Amino acid sequence: MSNLNKFRELRKEDNIDFYIIPSSDFHQSEYVSEYFKGREFISGFTGSVGTLLISQNQAYLWADGRYFIQAERELEGSGIELMKMATEGYPTLNEWLANNCKENSKVAFDGRVLSTVLYKEILEIAKENNFSIELNIDLLEICWIDRPSLPKEPIFIHETIFSGKS
């Protein structure tokens, strides 16, 4: 059974209609540690940027122009449809949610890795379309059995020559 299908089985038990997996970590970094590569684990897409939306019967990956060719190759045969960001004929994630989330649908995600801006946008769409949001669900914890640990390297201060002043 594919990781996507395992994930769908878990989601069904929680009555979640749509689950969003972004590419970021707790700090909204573009390049993340292995622990935060849930989108890659489920979809097989290895690009640094992309957002995965999973429903019981469909799955979509939003990727930008840097990754169109790579995503097409890596998603082939997965059942995940590529949504080409900033390309005519492809809705944004928010447009897709507004057009496809029916009244009383449930959209879930791990709120620790979603940007505040995207959360507020989805919240507004949810209010307009009368669907609910569950932001404290990390289904990856359950389905990714051998998930790498969170990084434990010590933090350090970069010298001003590298970090600049603000």
Explain the meaning of each model-derived region:
Residues 1-102, 114-166:
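N-terminal accessory/capping or targeting/presequence segment of soluble
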Residues 105-112:
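Acidic beta-strand-to-loop metal/phosphate-binding motif
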